[in-house]
Amino acid sequence: MADSVTIGQLEKLSVQCDKENQHVENKENNINSDNINLLEATKTTLPIPNTSNTNPPMNQSSSPTTTTTTPTTTTTPTTAEPAKKRKIFAKLHLLNRDGSVKNYFEMKKTKLIIGSDTELADIQVVRPGIYPKHVEIIYDKEKKKFYLNPLIDPKDSDNVRLNFVPFLHKKEVLGNGDIISIGFRSIKMEFIEKVTVDQLVQPEKQYIPSNTPTCITNTPIQTPPTTSPPSSTTTNKKDNTSTNVTKKPIATVPSTTTSTKKSSVVPESKPATKTITKETPKPTKTTTTTTVTTSKPTVKPTAVKKSINDDDYGDDYNEEEDDDDEEEEEEEEEEEEEEEVESKQIKVVNSKPNDDDMSCKKPMKYTNTNEEMRKSLASNVGGINSKIISKGDSVRNLLPISSRRPTAPVTPTKPTSTKKVTTPKKATVVKPPKESKVPKVPKVPKVPKAAVVASIDENGKEDYIRLISFKKAKDIVKAFQSHEKLVKSKNNGHGNISNEKKEILKCFEVLDQINWRLSTDKPGDSRPISSYFKNIPSLSEFDSELLTDYYSMISEPMSINSILSSVIYTADYNIDNCLDDFNQVLENSMTYNSENSIIYWLAHYCKIELYKALSNSGIIQNKLYLDIKKDSETFLKSIGTQLKGDGISLPQIIAQSVSKNKEQTVPQEEDEEEEEEEEEEEEEEEEGEEGKEDEEEEEKEEEEGEENEEEEDVEIDDCEIDQESDDDQ
């Protein structure tokens, strides 16, 4: 009975536990209904009651109820994960003008875009000429390198500079501390992520030693003969008789000489040109003799070795041409030092003739110095070559590019020898003046200025001109030529237009009837004043470079044929539109050409003639024509003075030719008479100009004759003064 009672009590307790657990689950489901993951977590953490666990006693049955509720309170905070910190690859420091750091930006992704757009770009730079996506900085995780990639056209890449180097047209590798300039805004890179650096291997420099010992060989080598001043000493033989023995000047012996018994004493490591002097007893007397020395002949070697630093010279450039003067000066200084040493030794010997020690030591010392000089020259068979190479390897100031002589033939000079007599005074040798070998640079003809990258407008701001491509320039020409051809193809369809437009067309035809030519042209060579403005520039007149420059500078091209086609085929095209387009034609020509040009002059002259024709036809008021004429004539005068100053002749306006329209009829006889009169007037003007030139030449000749007479008078006076001084002496 006791067992059944306990079993019943345990069943009641289990039912209560199940109810409590269900109540807790309902509360948690209501609280966390929005989060499905938390619901599943709470369900898994709550234990399901086991019916098999009915045997434990009463004190142990209450413990599962407390343990099951505790996990539910601890599961909720564990599901919220903390936000991960993003990796920083580099820092971009924004610099001020003085180089100080203004602010910095952390690069937290592998690609960073810099531009003017606030949405597309990570860093905004609002400056003129900056595109929405201007440049990007990339970090390659595989190669572990940072790259700078410009996203704009290479022609506009002057806005992007790496370490102040402009015109970046491809992806460049960045280094730690590099400065990126975008629209004159400097950004300094600081790497935080590890970067691999490519180790640059410099090429090995092969230096040639200037003085290397040479062994005796049987190969003939051409060496310039070098002479040394002979030393004269008197030696005593066994019979104590004094004889004068003069040593001949020693010359460098070619290495083709065969070794004899006497020369077998010379060791192999020393050059063959060394001479051995026999030991002589102490002399009792010394005599001095004046010796004549010959300077070393300057012989240019056949093959000159170039220095490593001479990469910028041409193939035909010779180092010896630049160092001839220095070599001659050094040789003269060496000779003068030798002469001073000789004079000092002679004075010492003459002052103490009976001193045996001094008489022995001084000549021996003199011979030793000569032998040392011969050793230094003979140590390298090409002594002169080694001297030139040693100078070539030294640091020197290079000639400017304009003064270098490209492809100048090297002409070897003949060896010259100058004799000098040893005297206590220094002998001065007068050198003939050298002719300047620098060729005259021809003057470069003036070329019209190309498109500028930036210009300053009236307000002082920079106005950037963007260069267009050659393809775009050709498209502009093609579009305008199709519009210009309408005038030629449908020129007979003028009947449908208004009378005002017909008068406008007649006024433009006046520009075709007025011709001009230069004084240097032939009498029959003339062209209309509107020839330069008839069509827009095309490939028939310009090359590809000038064509792109023209249409980069001229944003609104216009021509007279385009105006005529608009007059004929555009209904609402009136006189105001026509004058605006005509002024645009002249403005384009004056923008591209300089002020002191013939086209600039013709533009103002065409303007006067067109407004004059429009005023005569009554389309515009006469006051407007007079104002335009006054302004344009002042321009014509100033341009004319500039052209005369530059030596350019002004265009000569020829009378109007016969009109091509059938409505206007001009008799041919009158035209011929007018042409003859004009030709006669032109001939008279040319004769008058020639007469003026002849008079100017005669005046110049007379002035030169007077100057020559004055010079002769001065020479005669000088001769008389010299004669008087001679008579006085």
From Swiss-Prot:
Sequence ranges assigned to domain FHA in this UniProt record: 112-167
Instruction: Please note every region of biased composition (Acidic residues).
Output: 310-341, 668-729
Coiled-coil spans are 315-352, 659-718
**Known SUPFAM superfamilies for this protein?**
Bromodomain, SMAD/FHA domain
- Gene3D superfamilies from the entry? 2.60.200.20, Bromodomain-like (1.20.920.10)
Keywords of the record, alphabetical order, are: Bromodomain, Coiled coil
Q: Which InterPro entries match?
A: Bromodomain, Bromodomain-like_sf, SMAD_FHA_dom_sf
Q: Specify the domain of life of the species encoding this protein.
A: Eukaryota
Q: Low complexity compositional bias: what residue ranges?
A: 46-79, 208-221, 229-275, 283-306, 406-431
Q: What is this protein called?
A: Bromo and FHA domain-containing protein DDB_G0267958
Species name: Dictyostelium discoideum (Social amoeba)
